[in-house]
Each structure stands twice: as structure tokens, then as C-alpha cells.
A protein has these predicted regions:
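Conserved, structured core segments of small domains
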Residues: 1-96
């Protein structure tokens, strides 16, 4: 299922991860693990934020993806089902 991964890192945890060099490595490993089709980085509500879109093959993959973010960055992590324009078109057509 196409899924948007939202990762938010507090300023304190992000600063610590930048200083110790772990932030780029955790982000790299996460993007490799999910094989993201797209990833964007911004600030939302004063927190470093990443949005990555990927195919979540099984719900049992969630701990493998989320735990390094929880443990390494004290991040808030959300998995949000999403669709592209073509998938929306297909879904709306099924309504009749």
C-alpha cells in the first residue's frame, strides 16, 4: 500500500543527532529500508520533518521502519495511507 511516512524530530533531539553525526545515517538507512519513491524535508510546528512516500508491503514492516527513528532520534512517526492522482481517479471511478 502506498504510504506516506511522516517523521518529526524535536530541535533538541535533532541538534544532538547532528552534533554526534547520527542524523544523516539514520535518515539514509530509513530511506533505503523503505525504498522511498520520494522524500521531502521541511520544518513543521518547529520540528525537523521528513515526508517519504513508499510502498508498505506488510504492516509487520512498521516496527522495522519506526523503531530506529524512535530509538535513535526520539522521533514522532506516522504511517499515512495515500494515493497518487491515477489511484484517486481509479477509486472515484469505482463509485459509479
Amino acid at each position: 500500500m502506498r504510504t506516506m511516512l511522516k517523521v518529526q524530530i524535536s530541535a533538541e533531539a535533532g541538534n544532538r543527532a547532528i552534533k554526534d553525526g547520527s542524523l544523516p545515517e539514520i535518515i539514509r538507512k530509513t530511506l533505503e529500508a523503505v525504498q522511498a519513491e520520494a522524500a521531502y524535508f521541511t520544518a513543521v510546528d518547529g520540528k525537523r520533518t521528513m515526508f517519504a512516500v513508499f510502498d508498505l508491503k506488510a504492516s509487520s514492516d512498521i516496527p522495522r521502519i519506526a523503531e530506529p527513528l524512535f530509538m535513535g532520534l526520539n522521533a514522532a512517526v506516522e504511517f499515512i495511507p495515500c494515493m497518487n492522482a491515477e489511484e484517486l481517479k481509479t477509486g472515484l471511478a469505482a463509485l459509479g
